[in-house]
Amino acid sequence: MRTRVIVNGANGKMGILACETLENHEQFEVVAKLSRQDNLGQSILDTKAQIVVDLTRADCVYENSLTIINHGARPVIGTSGLVETQINELTKLCEIKQIGGIIAPNFSLGAILMMMLATKASEYFSEVEIIEGHHQQKLDAPSGTALKTAEMIAAARKKPKNKLPLKELTPGARGGSHHDINIHSLRLPGLLARQEVLFGNIGETLSITHNSIDRRCFMPGIVLACQKVLNLTNLVYGLEHLL
């Protein structure tokens, strides 16, 4: 029997590809393709969906996640915009409901490897900044991938970065800061998704860069998440935990 999946945000570019990918996969049945005017909770009940893949917007992803969990389906969240307090609340809710779920800041396997390599490098290089770039239709900044990368680096590095006594002549010139790591966000036509993690040391720099040039690169990660989530009893933050 195929696993019943709802794709929420099915009319977007990612949603269309996700529907096509899951419909052509022998393990899954797409039982509903939802957009903003649809009732997510009622659709879960009507279709008896086991998984909801959420590919919507930053301004509604938290409420969507609550709805999915409270209606007994397993969330596979590919929408950025969740902050740490919200992730913690969703984690607690999954524990109470004993429902597995996945929040994936990035579904690209190459991007996950970039984050893992950056985490390893941070054991040796404490000076690091992140430069992320996306298309101009992405309305939140910094990206979920950049935030997750900063969190992974901060947890792994062995000493704090240097405190520089500089004055910003233009406010924000040094970018934003997350876990004491500067993040610079670009929003330009011609970009899909790009991230560079730039490390510095005396006499050298190390750059780890990943470019997504086609949304199809995210599809293997969506399939992997849907395959793994039914076996989870807790909420997992980051696809790297499933590799």
UniProtKB/Swiss-Prot annotation:
Binding-site positions, NAD(+): 9-14, 78-80, 104-107
Pfam families for this protein: DapB_C, DapB_N
Subcellular locations according to the entry: Cytoplasm
EC numbers: 1.17.1.8
Listed GO MF terms: 4-hydroxy-tetrahydrodipicolinate reductase; NAD binding; NADP binding; oxidoreductase activity, acting on CH or CH2 groups, NAD or NADP as acceptor
Pathway stated in the Swiss-Prot or TrEMBL entry: Amino-acid biosynthesis; L-lysine biosynthesis via DAP pathway; (S)-tetrahydrodipicolinate from L-aspartate: step 4/4
GO cellular component: cytosol
Binding positions ((S)-2,3,4,5-tetrahydrodipicolinate): 135, 144-145
Gene Ontology BP terms: diaminopimelate biosynthetic process; lysine biosynthetic process via diaminopimelate
InterPro entries named among the record's database cross-references: DapB_C, DapB_N, DapB_N_CS, DHDPR_bac, NAD(P)-bd_dom_sf
Keywords: Amino-acid biosynthesis, Cytoplasm, Diaminopimelate biosynthesis, Lysine biosynthesis, NAD, NADP, Oxidoreductase
Catalyzed reaction equations: (S)-2,3,4,5-tetrahydrodipicolinate + NAD(+) + H2O = (2S,4S)-4-hydroxy-2,3,4,5-tetrahydrodipicolinate + NADH + H(+); (S)-2,3,4,5-tetrahydrodipicolinate + NADP(+) + H2O = (2S,4S)-4-hydroxy-2,3,4,5-tetrahydrodipicolinate + NADPH + H(+)
Active site positions: 134 (proton donor/acceptor), 138 (proton donor)
PROSITE patterns: DAPB
Superkingdom classification of source: Bacteria
Function in brief: Catalyzes the conversion of 4-hydroxy-tetrahydrodipicolinate (HTPA) to tetrahydrodipicolinate.
Family matches, as HAMAP family: DapB
Family: Belongs to the DapB family.
Protein name: 4-hydroxy-tetrahydrodipicolinate reductase
Organism: Legionella pneumophila (strain Paris)
